[in-house]
């Protein structure tokens, strides 16, 4: 009985996991950043705050790597007044830096228009908090043009809806029982990898299902996709996509023996064949109905 009473609901466990994860990331940011994340807590999901924390950490690493004033700084030495010491040109340089940079592990990271827009939105929100409260006297992010989005979104969801969708796939089976729970758990890591990849890179569903195991390059965090017309190109991904792919590869994919002719396929169906476009579309719609029942979701084929 005690075990049953201590069992957390899906939402409770998600909140706990994400809160602990955010606390760990905040340890890698300047101490004053905690005030911002505490302030936005009521209006954002934990997953959104985690994404913003990663994005803002990139900004401070950029300053330490590229701005002579902060060349010898450690992350703990930054104070809030350093924000108002920057000029619009510094923010523009950061925006340019985001297109291609190396992370802590020396992996080359690139950002699509969507990724660039999200990171700049995070920085503007961060600055806006301190400026609105008159903690800093100027906000250079307001004087910089934000990136325009031209690419078509694969799934038309806002940031919080995306967070809810991924959280549901991660923990939605917690309250299920029997065969429903068994099926949910069997496909969870695969589905989470697919959704995170689609949302994190903007590739088409047809490009996603066409991926082979050898198309993934974890050394540079890139995937080789075949575009319409047969042209191939490398699309780079971030830490969240990397983690989701590795979890899937080291669990579900490793434990599945593919049928003959499907040995190289990255994403396998429960029938041990390469997943098709229709199967992924149905999977996306299934989860989206649970999270946004009043919103029609159509993945980008």
Task: Name each model-derived stretch.
Residues 1-301:
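Conserved catalytic core of the tyrosine transesterase superfamily
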């Amino acid at each position: 009985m005690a075990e049953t009473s201590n069992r957390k609901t899906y939402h409770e466990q998600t909140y706990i996991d994400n809160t602990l994860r955010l606390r760990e990331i905040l340890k890698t940011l300047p101490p004053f950043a905690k005030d911002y994340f505490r302030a936005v807590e009521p209006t954002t999901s934990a997953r959104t705050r985690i994404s913003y924390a990663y994005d803002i950490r990139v900004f401070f690493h950029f300053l330490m790597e590229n701005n002579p004033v902060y060349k010898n700084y450690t992350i703990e030495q930054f104070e809030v007044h350093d924000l108002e010491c920057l000029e619009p040109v510094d923010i523009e340089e950061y925006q340019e830096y985001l297109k291609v940079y190396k992370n802590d592990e020396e992996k080359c990271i690139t950002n699509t228009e969507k990724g660039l827009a999200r990171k700049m939105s995070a920085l503007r929100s961060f600055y806006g908090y301190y400026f609105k409260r008159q903690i800093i006297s100027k906000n250079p992010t307001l004087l910089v043009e934000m990136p325009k989005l031209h690419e078509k979104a694969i799934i038309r969801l806002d940031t919080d809806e995306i967070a809810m969708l991924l959280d549901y796939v991660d923990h939605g089976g917690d309250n299920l029982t029997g065969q429903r729970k068994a099926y949910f758990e069997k496909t969870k890591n695969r589905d989470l990898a697919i959704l995170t990849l689609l949302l994190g890179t903007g590739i088409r569903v047809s490009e996603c299902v066409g991926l082979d195991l050898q198309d993934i390059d974890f050394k540079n965090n890139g995937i080789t996709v075949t575009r319409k017309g047969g042209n191939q190109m490398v699309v780079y991904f971030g830490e969240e996509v990397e983690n989701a792919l590795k979890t899937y590869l080291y669990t579900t994919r490793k434990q599945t023996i593919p049928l003959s002719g499907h040995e190289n396929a990255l994403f396998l169906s429960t029938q041990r064949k390469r997943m098709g476009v229709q199967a992924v579309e149905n999977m996306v719609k299934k989860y989206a109905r649970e999270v946004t029942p009043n919103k029609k979701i159509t993945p980008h084929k």
